[in-house]
């Protein structure tokens, strides 16, 4: 319960049960206002105000493109699968403080398992162990990334596949979110050091088609997704394909955005800085209410 600063029955905080009034307690200790939110939300908020969203809009401006973006989905890939949504500078809270939660959504590869089981540090380790048939030991995602890059001994294909699968399930989850929010996607968190192995799985899944009973194939996203980290795709994303069309029975013309498109990019701020910026701005907004 972020509004009242109370931590409830969270699966990853077993010591907090029955409601712990953390915010009010810290206020009483330090004598200053205290506000509570989660890292996924604050990461997205920081990126929307001072990171990915301004970066994309500045690139569009520099390219002479008239389009601007107002909505952002921020995801953090690390110990778990975090997500936050910002719509026109407003952080999506939800009526139950669950706005943007995706970790417990259905897994795109294993429908009876939650998404986070394939989008987390433990997922990378599990897939590598399964595919390499090696004892995982204390290998970290950094180690597995080094194996994927060929700078550490190990099963390179298994290492690369462990990150590709993470990207695939990430995108399978985000397809539904993107169809509702319709904005830029920014990725952050500890696993993004291996983004070059994660992004192919994301883009592959975003391009997946779904059928109808009559046999037609349709894209699962209404907008085309571009990998902003790829120079060719970034250039295509920044290309202005908007046109002016005639207003019937008048001499007027109106702008028509002929192409629906969104972009996926990796955080330049980094998760820690984005979260700090998000937390600062969130607190300022709460104080000014």
Language-model features: locations:
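Short beta-strand-to-turn element immediately C-terminal to the catalytic PLP-Schiff-base lysine
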Residues: 47, 84-88, 92-94, 107
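Conserved phosphate-binding catalytic cores of ATP/NTP-utilizing and phosphoryl-transfer enzymes
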Residues: 34-72
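ATP-binding/phosphotransfer module of carbohydrate and carboxylate kinases, centering on a glycine-rich
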Residues: 2-4, 24, 28-32, 59-66, ...
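Active-site nucleophile and cofactor-binding loops and adjacent substrate-binding regions
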Residues: 12-17, 35-43, 74-77, 266-274
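Anion-binding (especially nucleotide phosphate/pyrophosphate-binding) glycine-rich loop
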Residues: 18-32, 40, 55
